[in-house]
Amino acid sequence: MRKVLFTVALLLTACFVSAQVSVVKEAKSLKSKPEEAAKAIEPALTNPETANDPETWKLAGDFQKAIYDEENMKLYLPGGQADTTKLYNSLAKMYDFYLKCDEIEQAKVQSGELKKPKFRKKNADALKTLRLNLVNGGGDAYNKGDYADALKYFGLFVDVVNEPMFADDDELKADTLNALYACYATLAANMLKDNQAVIKYGNIGKNHKEEGYRALMCLAETYGQKEGGDSAKWLEVIKEGTELFPKQEYFVGNIMDYYIQKGMVDEGLAQINKLLATSETPYYLYVKGILLYEKKQYDDAVAIFNKIISNNGDLVAEAYSKIGDCYFFPAQIIVEENAKLAIDDPKYNENENKIKELYEKAKPYYEKAKELKPDNKALWGNYLLNIYWKLNRAEYDSLEKELG
């Protein structure tokens, strides 16, 4: 009885294998209709008997390439309209299937089942030839707001360089576009909040000489998150960005904020002075002025802010506002001191005169900032309210109504 059951089992297995083989044969017979062929071969990709045959994956990739070629041709025909979703999806599937074919084929070569690979060269040539078209797919998806597909296409472009079939392709590895499109993969990953992908592609993309700053910014955002962030990595990335892209204000601003928060103003001044030695931009001057302000070196800070004003470039309104701060905030220290004194205390009146004197100095600078940037109330609004309250109640009432 056992022998009979065993024989039946063998017959059933043989029939099942035969059925899967016939699926592959059917798919081959439909190669002139690639979409039908692609659908027909799908069961063979999951069945252990046929899924372990590199030819199955080669055929699946060929069908996807044929679908891609048909859609791509429409782009070049007068009045032709291609289905771009189908176009790029078939390209991505072709990549997946050819790479799987190579993986299985190489395993059989290493085990001795095959003497040498049959499909590697042809697959590699196809992948390399069509590789740039992945960028088109990524750009198309990104512009549509489909960041998942954008990440898929840009990621494939970058990842394929490290596939075993390209292990000896030094030209491909040296392609500067790898880092460029790793930047775009990073941007897409950042939009998806896919931290792992940001870190993976960001560390490649940061090496691009022109666009690498984008990858570093995304890395900084990822490491700077309150939950799951890494403050040490954040600082490392910000420092790297400052060194590699000193003209990008994002990194300079962040590193200076860090120095101020940590009480490391001297370190910040040393770094900003190095940057100013190479390029005296309004932003670098502004940062230096703020650092001097933080050290309470108000006269030196005012001199720097006046330089920004005399250059008449960017940040002029901000410079006027910061000069106002150099008088307003020292006055606030005296205001706090007076709050602890009795009104009949001789020191109280002396302090009141000092407060008014400092407010009088600050007033024209805040008013100039208001004139230059009336919509940016953070530069002048509350400061002028405080000053007018002390110096001129009519102006206070008018400004209070204006501010709402």
Per-region residue spans from a language model:
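Flexible helix-coil transition and linker loops at the boundaries of alpha-helical arrays
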Residues: 43-54, 100-127, 159-176, 207-208, ...
